[in-house]
């Protein structure tokens, strides 16, 4: 009989063998919630992020055996650090079945011409270069492991579709992530590597709580927007991850029903 795990009321088919996932940005927000969801579904999970204490807090929140969670403090903008992260993953668990490229940053709302070079580079390095470096290492590991293959899920954001006012760095990098997702999906086919993207609307995380208080709209007004619980995002990622490798959710958008997305921009 197949085994099932229950996460926020949804049943997910447990893998026939213990699968290994790596989540970036696992110390808070979406990354933390997804990492806990994967642990609850029976995965062994490598938790990557800049802050050691935050990663340890995530592990402490897990209801499963702490032996299934490996926190690895990592700066994903540093290729050498990313190589070390994937090396530790292979040494600890022997393989990698799922990479969730989640880590991302933004900057305060700013007129396009006022964005500094340092701000631009920080967003580009974290939101685009970091996922690319992680994808490279995931490819290398997934290609050589037995059985070959795995799945990569990129966190694209609603901003991969349409911008908010005064958000050029974040919007540009999230559009670029869509290109990375498509290229990864194409280049991974022959190695049984699937790649999809989840584009998330406003979720109730520390990074996005200001949205509930009011943010600039395309018409120049400032209005609050609805948020969804991060557990809804975790459920969506778990569904994408639960598919066999011969099936793939290429793009999924999840957001509050009343979020001003259609018609925005």
Show which residues each predicted segment covers.
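Conserved glycine-rich Rossmann-like NAD(P)H-binding loop of the short-chain dehydrogenase/reductase
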Residues: 41-57
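Residue(s) in the substrate-gating loop at a strand-loop-helix junction
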Residues: 157
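Conserved glycine-rich cofactor-binding loop
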Residues: 27-29
């Amino acid at each position: 009989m197949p085994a099932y795990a229950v996460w926020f009321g949804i049943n997910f088919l447990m893998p026939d063998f213990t699968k290994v996932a790596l989540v970036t940005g696992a110390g808070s927000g979406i990354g933390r919630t997804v990492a806990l969801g994967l642990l609850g579904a029976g995965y062994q999970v490598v938790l990557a992020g800049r802050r050691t204490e935050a990663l340890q807090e995530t592990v402490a929140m897990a209801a499963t055996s702490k032996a299934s969670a490996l926190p690895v403090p990592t700066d994903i903008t540093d290729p050498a650090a990313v190589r070390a992260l994937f090396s530790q993953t292979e040494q600890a668990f022997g393989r990698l079945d799922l990479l969730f490229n989640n880590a991302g940053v933004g900057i305060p709302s700013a007129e396009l011409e006022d964005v500094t070079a340092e701000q631009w580079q920080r967003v580009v390095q974290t939101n685009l270069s970091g996922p690319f470096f992680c994808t490279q290492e995931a490819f290398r590991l997934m290609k050589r492991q037995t059985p070959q293959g795995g799945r990569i899920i990129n966190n694209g954001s609603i901003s991969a579709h349409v911008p908010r006012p005064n958000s050029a760095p974040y919007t540009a990098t999230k559009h670029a992530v869509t290109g990375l997702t498509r290229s990864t999906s194409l280049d991974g086919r022959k190695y049984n590597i699937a790649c999809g993207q989840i584009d998330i609307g406003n979720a109730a995380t520390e990074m996005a709580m200001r949205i509930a208080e009011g943010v600039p709209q395309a018409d120049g007004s400032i209005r609050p927007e609805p948020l969804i619980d991060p557990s809804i995002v975790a459920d969506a990622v778990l569904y994408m991850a639960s598919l066999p490798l011969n099936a793939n959710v290429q793009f999924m958008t999840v957001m509050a029903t009343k979020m001003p997305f259609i018609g925005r921009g």
